[in-house]
Amino acid sequence: MPTPNTASPQAKGFRRAVSELDAKQAEAIMSPRFIGRRQSLIEDARKEREKAEAASAASSEPGDLLEAAVSKEKDGKAMLNLLFTLRGAKTSSLSRAVKAFETFEAQIHHLETRPVQRPRAGGPHLEYFVRCEVPSADLPALLSSVRRVAEDVRGAGENKVLWFPRKVSELDKCHHLVTKFDPDLDLDHPGFSDQVYRQRRKLIAEIAFQYKHGDPIPRVEYTAEEIATWKEVYTTLKSLYVTHACREHLEAFQLLERFSGYREDSIPQLEDVSRFLKERTGFQLRPVAGLLSARDFLASLAFRVFQCTQYIRHASSPMHSPEPDCCHELLGHVPMLADRTFAQFSQDIGLASLGASDEEIEKLSTLYWFTVEFGLCKQNGEVKAYGAGLLSSYGELLHSLSEEPEIRAFDPDAAAVQPYQDQTYQSVYFVSESFSDAKDKLRNYASRIQRPFSVKFDPYTLAIDVLDSPHAIRRSLEGVQDELHTLAHALSAIG
């Protein structure tokens, strides 16, 4: 049940808060260019799922259909797995389909009906699944016969696990960029007509394209204009943190100012920040040229690697960027990744994504959106912000803790399917009782994701252990027993 946002004494109407700003800030926060948001991981995940569905439909081509439908071939026989619907609901339609299999002496191992996942108006509501063994030489003719009496004929081969990185070095392969908001391609990008800015972006992007795991992150010599943009964002946001940011963000931000070069007149270097994070929580930064695909980005989190941009937003729009930039990453994400519990929460989302279906990736991306990007939490009877999208956006940070949005208790099942807003501020936010509570709820949600295996991160080798056999589980259990032995010894020493 939605809960009113009354926990924070500093909460006030959003428009009232804006009216207390100077004219320049107020105009920026209320302008469409400020409110407009960059493309999210959710949108990318949704597009990937739609592409996969389109590819599945395209597999109705004869050659593709054969590849998708045949699970194995041996001794001149092929195991065929087919899904199809029938024209009309008459018994004769099914009889004609069965006759096609009989003609080619197919040995039917399994036949069942299933509800159509996305029934069309007036269309069939049942689909048929057939597993049969048929002479390999007759495959093309059989499929042709079935297609004459059935509709939507497609392969239903055994579920294949999608590739995912097993070693941290394999993140070098996870570099699929979403280019929708590239300043070279997006007419609405603030830097589209600025050739100097576009060339600068290409120069900085090349660092990410050339980077390999294990390399030190090259340093960027930022220009005076870039530092001025950083200063405006840095000072404006910092003035709100003391009243709006969660305790963990405030504590880490102070440490970053002391040890990692966080100050208004200098943009921190990723290599310095990465070393700081590694000492705190084991997270590392990796340079990226832009917005990664959802699957690649989430996979990186499984290794405690955060893909981080080095470029900065255009100087004409310091209070808004249509894409992630170093202001968003360094001011919003990095301080939170310095907290151990939050770092584990982030890694858990990444681990849950490995080998997951496109549909689950979309749900996990939505969860990421409403937690890591736009999450709220309770602290000392008040509601505070911990989401990076809030902590790097002056306007939305004010809005999220005002009286205007609806605040709901964090429930992963609800958050994973909650419609999100990318054209204006969110109308709904989810508040967690604590990071530990959010972590436990996320793990419960992830345990219900259907995969033929579990995964575990090995912090010694920076690799993913795939637990898909008794042997793999026993080997992992040995490590747990060693850790328990150490803890038991420590307890006895204290006692």
From Swiss-Prot:
<keyword id="KW-0479">Metal-binding</keyword>
<feature type="binding site">
    <location>
        <position position="333"/>
    </location>
    <ligand>
        <name>Fe cation</name>
    </ligand>
</feature>
<dbReference type="GO" id="GO:0005634">
    <property type="term" value="C:nucleus"/>
</dbReference>
<dbReference type="GO" id="GO:0001666">
    <property type="term" value="P:response to hypoxia"/>
</dbReference>
<dbReference type="Pfam" id="PF12549">
    <property type="entry name" value="TOH_N"/>
</dbReference>
<dbReference type="GO" id="GO:1990384">
    <property type="term" value="P:hyaloid vascular plexus regression"/>
</dbReference>
<keyword id="KW-0597">Phosphoprotein</keyword>
<comment type="pathway">
    <text>Catecholamine biosynthesis; dopamine biosynthesis; dopamine from L-tyrosine: step 1/2.</text>
</comment>
<dbReference type="InterPro" id="IPR001273">
    <property type="entry name" value="ArAA_hydroxylase"/>
</dbReference>
<feature type="modified residue" description="Phosphoserine">
    <location>
        <position position="469"/>
    </location>
</feature>
<dbReference type="InterPro" id="IPR019774">
    <property type="entry name" value="Aromatic-AA_hydroxylase_C"/>
</dbReference>
<dbReference type="Pfam" id="PF00351">
    <property type="entry name" value="Biopterin_H"/>
</dbReference>
<dbReference type="GO" id="GO:0005506">
    <property type="term" value="F:iron ion binding"/>
</dbReference>
<dbReference type="InterPro" id="IPR041903">
    <property type="entry name" value="Eu_TyrOH_cat"/>
</dbReference>
<dbReference type="InterPro" id="IPR021164">
    <property type="entry name" value="Tyrosine_hydroxylase_CS"/>
</dbReference>
<dbReference type="GO" id="GO:0043204">
    <property type="term" value="C:perikaryon"/>
</dbReference>
<dbReference type="GO" id="GO:0006585">
    <property type="term" value="P:dopamine biosynthetic process from tyrosine"/>
</dbReference>
<dbReference type="InterPro" id="IPR018301">
    <property type="entry name" value="ArAA_hydroxylase_Fe/CU_BS"/>
</dbReference>
<protein>
    <recommendedName>
        <fullName>Tyrosine 3-monooxygenase</fullName>
        <ecNumber>1.14.16.2</ecNumber>
    </recommendedName>
</protein>
<comment type="similarity">
    <text>Belongs to the biopterin-dependent aromatic amino acid hydroxylase family.</text>
</comment>
<comment type="function">
    <text>Catalyzes the conversion of L-tyrosine to L-dihydroxyphenylalanine (L-Dopa), the rate-limiting step in the biosynthesis of cathecolamines, dopamine, noradrenaline, and adrenaline. Uses tetrahydrobiopterin and molecular oxygen to convert tyrosine to L-Dopa. In addition to tyrosine, is able to catalyze the hydroxylation of phenylalanine and tryptophan with lower specificity. Positively regulates the regression of retinal hyaloid vessels during postnatal development.</text>
</comment>
<feature type="compositionally biased region" description="Basic and acidic residues">
    <location>
        <begin position="41"/>
        <end position="53"/>
    </location>
</feature>
<keyword id="KW-0560">Oxidoreductase</keyword>
<feature type="region of interest" description="Disordered">
    <location>
        <begin position="41"/>
        <end position="65"/>
    </location>
</feature>
<feature type="site" description="Important for substrate specificity">
    <location>
        <position position="422"/>
    </location>
</feature>
<feature type="modified residue" description="Phosphoserine; by CaMK2 and PKA">
    <location>
        <position position="40"/>
    </location>
</feature>
<dbReference type="Pfam" id="PF21417">
    <property type="entry name" value="TH_ACT"/>
</dbReference>
<dbReference type="InterPro" id="IPR036329">
    <property type="entry name" value="Aro-AA_hydroxylase_C_sf"/>
</dbReference>
<dbReference type="GO" id="GO:0005737">
    <property type="term" value="C:cytoplasm"/>
</dbReference>
<dbReference type="InterPro" id="IPR045865">
    <property type="entry name" value="ACT-like_dom_sf"/>
</dbReference>
<keyword id="KW-0127">Catecholamine biosynthesis</keyword>
<dbReference type="GO" id="GO:0008021">
    <property type="term" value="C:synaptic vesicle"/>
</dbReference>
<keyword id="KW-0963">Cytoplasm</keyword>
<comment type="subunit">
    <text>Homotetramer. Interacts (when phosphorylated at Ser-19) with YWHAG; one YWHAG dimer bounds to one TH tetramer this interaction may influence the phosphorylation and dephosphorylation of other sites.</text>
</comment>
<keyword id="KW-0770">Synapse</keyword>
<feature type="binding site">
    <location>
        <position position="373"/>
    </location>
    <ligand>
        <name>Fe cation</name>
    </ligand>
</feature>
<dbReference type="GO" id="GO:0030424">
    <property type="term" value="C:axon"/>
</dbReference>
<keyword id="KW-0539">Nucleus</keyword>
<keyword id="KW-0408">Iron</keyword>
<keyword id="KW-0966">Cell projection</keyword>
<feature type="modified residue" description="Phosphoserine; by CaMK2">
    <location>
        <position position="19"/>
    </location>
</feature>
<dbReference type="GO" id="GO:0007507">
    <property type="term" value="P:heart development"/>
</dbReference>
